Regions:
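…; additionally, a secondary subgroup of soluble metalloenzymes is captured
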Residues: 211, 215-239
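Short catalytic/ligand-binding loop motif for oxyanion handling, primarily in non-cytosolic enzymes
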Residues: 24-27, 77-80, 160-162
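Acidic/histidine-rich catalytic neighborhood
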Residues: 65, 71-109
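Short, well-ordered beta-to-alpha junction loops that form the rim of enzyme active sites
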Residues: 18-23, 72, 154-157
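Histidine-centered active-site/metal-ligand motif
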Residues: 26-30, 74, 173-178
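Active-site neighborhoods of enzymes that stabilize oxyanions during catalysis
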Residues: 98-219
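A long, amphipathic alpha-helix that forms part
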Residues: 1-16, 23-66, 116, 216
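Structural motif
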Residues: 15-19, 69, 192
Length: 239
């Protein structure tokens, strides 16, 4: 923040970006389990940096002609060892390559009956399997050759895993995680904005991360490149 004020603001840039320092991922995962004081301390650190930046704009007489936008890339939700689903209870992992995560990808061998695989996985609690062509359109996760043939949506707060992983990692999963269905409120990020291009004193409904690009380009008077955002999102927040 201090560098933005010192080095960039005098040159009147069109756009300045600042990535806030945060907790190392391992500490954040551990802290999120009970929203420990470390998380509060990280928030206070970011808040103090924003306060210095706003004070710097005010001192320089620039507060009312600079748009300030604060965003986060995603939310977090607690996960724990007692909320796990063993994928290997329904699937022979020797016949399937697995991309593990909050959205699981399955690359079955040619000999695997894909429909039967989807049925077996979906029979497990807290998992929903489907062909990539059947992934809900709102997730934009169907039309690329790097997307696995079978996509498994994991219920937020749960972890798809295997017996061998649990044996090798007796303390995991724990803390918090992200990457679940973005319709889940805990996955929502943050969007705060003030400045000459933004409406004042209003609270709008949820925005999607893919909408931020269109909002910023319109505020800057630029024509956006093709993107997955909703152009109407800018109407909700801009003057």
């Amino acid at each position: 923040m201090d560098a933005l004020l010192r080095d960039y603001l005098p040159t009147a840039p069109d756009l300045g970006l600042y990535v806030a320092p945060d907790l190392p991922a391992a500490k954040l995962r551990a802290a999120l389990a009970d929203y420990a004081p470390e998380v509060d301390a990280a928030i206070e650190k970011v808040d103090a940096a924003l306060a210095r930046f706003v004070d710097g704009l005010r001192t320089r007489g620039r507060l009312d002609d600079v748009d300030l936008v604060v965003v986060s890339d995603h939310g977090m939700t607690p996960v724990s060892r007692d909320r796990t689903v063993r994928l290997d209870a329904a699937v022979d992992l020797a016949t399937v390559d697995v991309d593990w995560g909050e959205v699981v990808g399955l690359w079955p061998a040619d000999t695997v009956d894909v429909d039967a695989l989807i049925t077996r996985v979906s029979a497990l609690s807290h998992l929903t399997a489907m062909r990539k062509a059947d992934v809900p359109e709102r997730l934009h996760y169907s039309n690329h050759d790097r997307i696995p043939p079978v996509v498994v949506l994991v219920e937020p707060g749960w972890t798809a895993t295997s017996a061998s992983y649990l044996e090798r990692n007796p303390e995991r999963p724990s803390g918090g995680s992200h990457g679940f269905d973005n319709a889940f409120p805990d996955m929502h990020g943050l969007f705060l904005a003030r400045g000459p291009h933004f409406r004042s004193g209003v609270e709008v409904g949820p925005l999607r991360t893919v909408d931020v690009y269109g909002i910023l380009t319109r505020a800057m008077g630029l024509d956006p490149a093709p993107n997955a955002g909703d152009p109407a999102a800018a109407d909700r927040v801009l003057r």
